[in-house]
Amino acid sequence: MVIFRTMGDVKLYLTHGGIWVENKYYGGNTNMVFVDKTLTVYELLVKVHEIVVCDLDRFVYELVSVFDTDGRVIRLNIKTDRDLHYVLVEANVNPPEIYVSVQEV
């Protein structure tokens, strides 16, 4: 986890342990991390696992970010590096928030 912030870092909220009700995530815990704008999904999953420890033989992480565009709420599943780049750089949300769900395999 990055402790000291650098010029290329983005503040990111990781929220986990809550529940989805339609397009809203309720409850849980939020951790703030600083990540590089070029962070990959794999690197993000490593950071998530440092915070949300679970048995990866039985569970997988689902990463989602929520955006309000012209009154329409969009849940973006973050599966690729391109998805993550959109959340961190292009979406103009400051700070971005990623919701972490743990799904049984």
Predicted regions, residues:
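Phospho-regulated scaffold assembly regions enriched in serine/threonine/proline and acidic residues
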Residues: 1-105
